[in-house]
Amino acid sequence: METRKEIIKQMGDEMREDIFLEVNNRIERSLRRRFWLRISAVAASVTLLFGISNYISFHEGYKKLNSQMIEMVNPMGMRSSVVLSDGTKVILNAGTTLSYPAAFVSGQREVKVNGEAFFEVSHDKEHPFIVSAENVKVKVLGTKFNVKAYDDDDNIEVTLAEGKVGVGLDTKNLIQIMPGQQIKYMKASHRFIKREVRLQSYTAWVCGKFYFTNYPLEKIAKQLERSFNVRIQILGDDLRKAAFTGDFVRGENIDQILRVMTANRPIRYEIEGDQITISKTLLSKEIFP
């Protein structure tokens, strides 16, 4: 039978062991707490850095997205329109390419056009709107105007419908025009001509119409080629230079237009698919008697 001393000693050993285990557990819990606090701090730092990195990347991507140029190509035989990020509406004629940013940034509003386009520019006094057509610049604040600048044309024409625009080879030295006026830039001589025009003759295409006033046939043929996606061959220099006047409304096809143009004139035309040939009648010596 155990003596009192042995029992007391055994209890003391057990108490010391319990006390040791408790102290050890507390130390381990403290160490674990410190460890997880450090891990949490590191994780928080990584999360913060990741968040900042994502924020920077997002905004860099946003700028890249907004500065990215969009090229809109309108095929032959069609008209189309687009509304830019500032609210400006652009109507594209057949065979026209418009280059513009996804969104205007840094206060710059500039687009490029190759072909023909009618602009309805959203007014912004602080940020002028600039159209580049080859080496010609058109600068406006808010207005309606037409730009015709096809690669195969000899001239670039800017015709004003409303407001006021400036036209030049840069954005500083500009020629100002008023509604009903046109600036014609002659590519060969690098000269500008300012003149009064019949506005409908240069903007009717927006509504699908044609207004020709003493237009040479070769110029009319180019418009018809683009609008109807056909090829027109004119036989004879005198016929190419012959002037025509006429108005044609929406819905008339190429055959109807040519029929009206050649009526009561010593001219005939033949249509084979998308190929059209215009020539003088065999017995005619002059285009117009």
What do these predicted ranges mean?
Residues 1-31:
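Disordered, charged N-terminal biogenesis/targeting segments of membrane/secreted proteins
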